[in-house]
Regions:
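Extreme N-terminal, non-catalytic leader segments
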Residues: 1-27
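Residue-level preference for the first positions of well-ordered beta-strands
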Residues: 25-27, 55, 99-101
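Hydrophobic anchor at the beta1->P-loop junction of P-loop NTPases
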Residues: 30
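The conserved Walker
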Residues: 34
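Conserved lysine of the Walker
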Residues: 38
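Conserved substrate/cofactor phosphate-moiety recognition/catalytic segment
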Residues: 43-88
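ATP-dependent NMP and nucleoside kinases share a basic, alpha-helical "lid"
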Residues: 67-74, 78, 90-149, 155
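Small-molecule kinase domains that catalyze NTP-dependent phosphoryl transfer to phosphate-bearing small molecules
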Residues: 130-186, 194-199
Length: 199
């Protein structure tokens, strides 16, 4: 790629964007099994932050796969690419001072490590939404676990593909001990001090 040249040095700095918005641009990377509550928690927190005057963007795995990543399958390589693209998009938002909440199963440690490397360690917070496989199967609002059990979905995390739990996440939220609203409040209380220092 000798014909490509970065123009990042010509752009407005992240710190200037943050001053304008009066907030810190960070990424909350929500990881957990399908049906663990990632998207529900993200939406709650985004709405709560909006009422306080914070600019946020939720990047939901399903929505991303219906758009920019619709050409990707659920193979190991495509899952990695799904994470890579989402992380690159998140970085663009974060560099504009926007609080970005990514909701992806991202089942492997190396996938989440890649996301952190792209977004930047100081801007990346890994949030583990800890929900048992049993509870996720009981919820199964999309019917995906039933399909996976019948063999209709290949490489489905938790059934035919493993999930590697984060060993040292920035925050571990157990939905067994807390319902969705309580879990959302835990995340809200965690993120508020991180983004408020310019106010």
């Amino acid at each position: 790629m000798d014909n490509l040249f970065s123009t990042n040095h010509e752009l407005i700095l992240k710190t200037e964007m943050e001053k304008l918005l009066k907030q810190k641009g960070i990424c909350l990377w929500l990881t957990g099994l399908s049906g663990s509550g990632k998207t529900s928690i993200a939406k709650y927190v985004a709405k709560k932050l909006h009422t306080k005057g914070f600019l946020t963007k939720v990047l939901d795995g399903d929505n991303i796969r219906l758009g920019i990543n619709k050409n990707l399958s659920f193979s190991e390589a495509d899952r990695m690419e799904n994470v890579r693209r989402t992380a690159e998009i998140s970085k663009l938002f974060v560099d504009c001072g926007i609080i970005t909440i990514c909701c992806l199963v991202s089942p492997k440690k190396n996938m989440r490590t890649l996301a952190k490397e792209i977004i930047g360690k100081k801007n990346f917070y890994e949030i583990f939404i800890s929900t048992s496989l049993e509870d996720c199967e009981i919820r199964d609002t999309k019917g995906l676990y039933k399909k996976a059990r019948r063999g209709e979905l290949l490489n489905f995390t938790g059934i035919s593909s493993p999930y590697e739990e984060p060993l040292g996440p920035s925050l571990n939220i157990s939905t067994k001990e807390n319902n969705i609203e309580e879990s959302s409040k835990i995340l809200y209380n965690f993120v508020l001090p991180l983004i408020s220092e310019l106010r």
